[in-house]
Amino acid sequence: MKLLHLALAGAMMAASFAAPAMAADANTMTIQLKDGPVVVQLMPELAPKHVKQIKELASKGEYDNVVFHRVIDGFMAQTGDVEFGKQGGKSFAPSRAGMGGSALPDIPAEFSRTPFERGVVGMARSQSPNSANSQFFIMFTKYPSLDGQYTVVGKVVSGMENVDKIKKGTGGNGEVTDPDRMLKVTVGQ
């Protein structure tokens, strides 16, 4: 009888460890790049509305084949312009990439105290703090001037070496000619 209780306690303990892993999986975004996958742990506890919108866009395939239109070495790589950033065909407008968003509404700012450092994923926006929509950026390094000014939505937990290989832009704005792209973006897989 005592052995049965120990086995049952062990099974219950194993089940309690399995539950959080499943919850974390629902907030895992995988970005497939030409050099390999990048896994981002999304943080709905910091930015629930932003994370919800990213998940919705990813689940609809809206981020697939979208270019990294602005990449500044030593700063960040920006992507997610689903309106203008599609690679190939008529949907790719290099002169307009970075100017759009998605068909979904803009999201009010959800600023936090989480610092912008290497691997942090933040939402891009215009001058208005409440203008984030679909575009996001991945930090190459720490950048304190962004802290509390932009919404943090996640952090790269693996594949940062693949982010480092994204083709860099030129000039002060980091516009990229013949840019790399997100081949496929999935959430919870």
Language-model features: locations:
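Cyclophilin-like peptidyl-prolyl cis-trans isomerases
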Residues: 3-6, 10, 16-189
